[in-house]
Structure formats: structure tokens, C-alpha cells
Amino acid sequence: MEGGYEQGGGASRYFHNLFRPEIHHQQLQPQGGINLIDQHHHQHQQHQQQQQPSDDSRESDHSNKDHHQQGRPDSDPNTSSSAPGKRPRGRPPGSKNKAKPPIIVTRDSPNALRSHVLEVSPGADIVESVSTYARRRGRGVSVLGGNGTVSNVTLRQPVTPGNGGGVSGGGGVVTLHGRFEILSLTGTVLPPPAPPGAGGLSIFLAGGQGQVVGGSVVAPLIASAPVILMAASFSNAVFERLPIEEEEEEGGGGGGGGGGGPPQMQQAPSASPPSGVTGQGQLGGNVGGYGFSGDPHLLGWGAGTPSRPPF
């Protein structure tokens, strides 16, 4: 009985050891660890499944935005390829340094002056040459200066007053024989339909002994050597009479209350009748051996001056 009890007692101790809490804890721990790994793996799969729809929706939003930007008219493929979804701000580099195209005037202004250098051949009439040039070009010519040599010049000179305040010699035409150097030549030549007498040339000449004479040119003016003229041409010239009409009306009203006197705008009579080129025969005489015909008082040289050699 004791042996059987001992055997039974040993078996009870063996079974008692099997049911100890430490053994149960050691056996349950690996099983619990496996369950925790499986649970963590399951949670990770659920999290990935939740993120996948959000990523798909985000990609669809990006595709819609790109499609919208490509449909816009101001989208640039170059900028969209370099920085998608962004537009460059500011001015492109180097845009301020671009060369501007030059301004080219294709036609002249009708009121502009043109400069000309005119050469008159020897033996030609200077007045006729300039008049023909103005008529063919249809432009007015303003002669600013000239140099050269002319011969047998015909001038119209003004009236010279006498010592007592009266007129000692009437205005007329004087012809100078010989060769003369041009000191100054100015005036204007207008093409038709300009009124007659609107233009004219004035000249100053020097003789061989240093004498200077001048006046208005009466054609012809023959060039004995090449004559160079500096001139300017113009067009669209407007001819106007001065004073203007408003002043004429005011002057006419004021003159009417003056007791029957002549109107203020009436042209005053000339002090001496004008003489043409044909009036040279009326100016007989010779001044101290000078080779020109006319009144000796026209050039300011009196009849009592001593004789001088010709030019």
C-alpha cells in the first residue's frame, strides 16, 4: 500500500507540476505572441486598403487639374513641362534689353525745306535758270547766297533823296558793263500760279577797283563763269495779304468818321512812277567814265566827283 501510495503520490506530484501556473504561462506566451503578429499584419493590410482609395482620388484630382490647364488658352507647354501647375511670375529675363526696331520715315513732310546747291553754267541766264527750275519742280526756291562772276548786269535802283529833302533822281534801271564778282545774291523765285512780282533777286557786286554796287536784278543776269547758288526749296506756300481782313474792316469803319477823308487802307500813291527795262533811254548820261548808263545820282556819286577808271 505504501508502494502504491508512493506511486500514486509521485504521479500526483507529476500532475501537480503540470498544472503549475508558470508552465501555463510559458505555454500560452508563444501562442499569444503569434496572435499579436497576426493582428498587427491584419491591421496593416486594412490601413493600406484605406489609403488606396485616397491615393486614387488624389491622382484623379491631379489629372483633372492638368487637363484643365491644357484647355486654357494662355497655358504654355514649355512652362507646363518645366513646372507643372505653376505659371511663371514677372517679366522674362532679357526682355528689357531687346533692340527696338528703328523708326523709318518713308516720305517727307510737304512743308519741309530741302537744301540745294545749284550750279549755273557759263553763258546762262541765272534768273531764267532758277525760274525754269522752280516751274518744273513745282516748288518755290529761296536763294540764300551765291558766288561767281557775272557780266553786263542790269539793276533797278531806288530813289535817292536830294540835299533839300526832295527827290534828286528818279528810280530807274542801270546797266553795268564788264565783269563783276558776286558778293551777295538773295531772293525768292515762285512757280506759277504765284502773282507777278511776288519774287525777285537782289545782288551786290564788286568791281575791279573795289567798288561795290547793288540793287534788284533785272533779267538777264549772265554768268561769265560757273556760278554756285545755295538755295532751299519749299512747297505749299500760302500767299496772304497783310493786314488781314478784320483789320481792314476796323480801319474802314474808323476812316468813315473822319469827315470824308480817304480810307486808311487805300494804297498810297507811289513817289515815282515805276520804270521798266525799256526806260534806259530816259537815263542818259555817264558818270565819270564808268561803263554804265543812267542817272549819276542813282549810285550816290555826284556829278562833281573826279573821273575814275572803269571797272
UniProtKB/Swiss-Prot annotation:
Residues 86-98 bind DNA. It comes from the Eukaryota. Residues 110-258 form the PPC domain. Disruption phenotype: AHL27 and AHL29 double mutant exhibit a long hypocotyl phenotype in the light. It comes from Arabidopsis thaliana. Residues 55-75 have a biased composition (Basic and acidic residues). This is AT-hook motif nuclear-localized protein 27. Residues 40-105, 246-311 are annotated as: Disordered. Homodimer. Interacts with AHL12, AHL25, AHL29, TCP4, TCP13, EF114, ATAF2/NAC081, histone H2B.1, histone H3.3 and histone H4. Transcription factor that specifically binds AT-rich DNA sequences related to the nuclear matrix attachment regions (MARs). Negatively regulates plant innate immunity (PTI) to pathogens through the down-regulation of the PAMP-triggered FRK1 expression. Acts redundantly with AHL18, AHL22 and AHL29 in the regulation of flowering and regulation of the hypocotyl elongation. Acts as a chromatin remodeling factor that negatively regulates the leaf senescence. Acts redundantly with AHL29/SOB3 to modulate hypocotyl growth inhibition in response to light.
